[in-house]
Amino acid sequence: MASTRKPSGHGAEVEAQKRSSSNSSTKSAKAETFEPMQLQRSVTNPRAVGIPESKRLPESFRKRSSDPAVCKPDFSSLSTVLEHVDSLTIDEKKTSGFGSVKTSSASAKLSDGTSSLGKTSGSAKLSGRLDFMESGKSSICRGSTSSDVSDESSCSSFSSTVNKPHKANDLRWEAIQAVRVRDGLLGLSHFRLLKRLGCGDIGSVYLSELSGTKCYFAMKVMDKTSLASRKKLLRAQTEREILQSLDHPFLPTLYTHFETEKFSCLVMEFCPGGDLHTLRQRQPGKHFSEQAVKFYIAESLLALEYLHMLGIVYRDLKPENVLVREDGHIMLSDFDLSLRCLVSPTLVKSAAIESDPLRKNVYCVQPACIEPSCIQPSCTVPTTCFSPRLFSSKSKKDRKPKNDTANQVRPLPELVAEPTDARSMSFVGTHEYLAPEIIKGEGHGSAVDWWTFGIFLYELLFGRTPFKGSGNRQTLFNVVGQPLRFPETPVVSFAARDLIRGLLMKEPQQRLGFKRGATEVKQHPFFEGVNWALIRCATPPEIPKPVELEKGAVSVAEAPSSQKTAAGLVLNAQKGSDNYLEFDFF
């Protein structure tokens, strides 16, 4: 089994893993079959979840589930259950002589027997693949000192509410609410753990089913004693509070959370489509087409805009953390490194590009402007940059003067919701995605998200990050000291390269999005033609193939690649003998 690395240093720990090269091979072990475990009804402490005494249902009104898995447990404790599941789903990590990680993963078929999953009629189809695939980006996190705690926990508080308007038609949400109305409180006794999806820095995640339904969830189980001893309680609390505050189509849903004497559990959305890193590896040339990139980038941008509006600086955007739902749309994940702060959304009058001398020559707003030489102000008129005006033969002297006041269209006010006052000294993120101001220790704010957004865009287009070196040290040096360069292939539009240039300005004050956030980024010509209001109606570049769950057995649909990854799960291994696993799902 994978061992958890002990924290190093006095309050400063590094969580690093070596990103495997694109040519590293992944071996899939033969599927194995095992009997699922029966769960013991746990005793949930009402005070632990904050239910007032007056609102607790009497014990006589709490109906017991008819599921035999709940009424007749085979295990004496949750620890035994989890240990038994873990022993059946171990992913063996092998390190090659070149430092690349080879993953031997078991796609286990679940034979349910007499459990409630087998009793449900028909087969449950989950769009996506249960793929297991390695991920190699080096993630680092300097442990919070007392100053970090005050810096990142004394900001705005997040309210916990069960009101989720975007989940009005979600069957899983309705099932959770029905159980809550019936039993008052949800606990481990209401779920059956089907399979361990993976383990990570602060917990393990299990594919689980709400007993008596066909509703599947990803349950993150964290050992509270381990979190306390490793000083990770703040990270776990931050993640839970952020998840509670979210209600957005491209962000995860926290359906419920509860605690036992030993464990803290988060029940979240199960994304069976994998992540964008895995999906990119399966593309020709291991990079996406520009049209596909525009789709994924646009949805990620809306998610970042929403987070910033709530005063949340994400700080961990990368393909491994962008999951693909069953319908092909995306969902950001993993919020334990996020920074919370105060923000004041305001409506400001928008000025035309021509009236702002600082923005006038930044980029050419015409789609035809694909050459770097075409960046003069004349490109802002609605004509092509390659030839003279074909439909106007009159010179400027012959033209009649226009009434500028009458013809000028007043722009609508813009919503600016950028936490520009956010400030942190923490050293967190992924080596290849770290912003220069983080590396130099100058303190950072929300502009780091626009830097990572640029790296993210670059990787999806070109199949690699722009500043990756031979090692982590060289990578950090390149981020700070090396200029941005673009490869000759694949060929991308000037608008795409110009957007990357604006996002990857090394000085945060000059970075695109620094002042007006997502509003400024969305106005870039790269996004021309994107209908932001109806983006959820757009057809995704790829819709995952279905995974059938019938009679308790997991059957992975045939994939175009032999590499199978767990739904939205990425296991990172540190180079060396530690065999340390970092879980990048949540």
Curated annotation (Swiss-Prot):
Known role: Protein kinase that regulates the auxin transport activity of PIN auxin efflux facilitators by direct phosphorylation. D6PK-mediated PIN phosphorylation promotes auxin transport in the hypocotyl and this is a prerequisite for PHOT1-dependent hypocotyl bending.
Keyword Kinase: yes
Organism, scientific name: Arabidopsis thaliana (Mouse-ear cress)
Extent of Polar residues compositional bias: 97-123
Key word Disulfide bond present: no
GN (gene name): D6PKL2
Active site: 316
PROSITE patterns reported for this sequence: PROTEIN_KINASE_DOM (PS50011), PROTEIN_KINASE_ST (PS00108)
Full protein name: Serine/threonine-protein kinase D6PKL2
Domain Protein kinase as annotated: residue spans: 191-527
Family under the similarity heading: Belongs to the protein kinase superfamily. AGC Ser/Thr protein kinase family.
Source organism superkingdom: Eukaryota
UniProtKB keywords: ATP-binding, Auxin signaling pathway, Cell membrane, Kinase, Membrane, Nucleotide-binding, Serine/threonine-protein kinase, Transferase
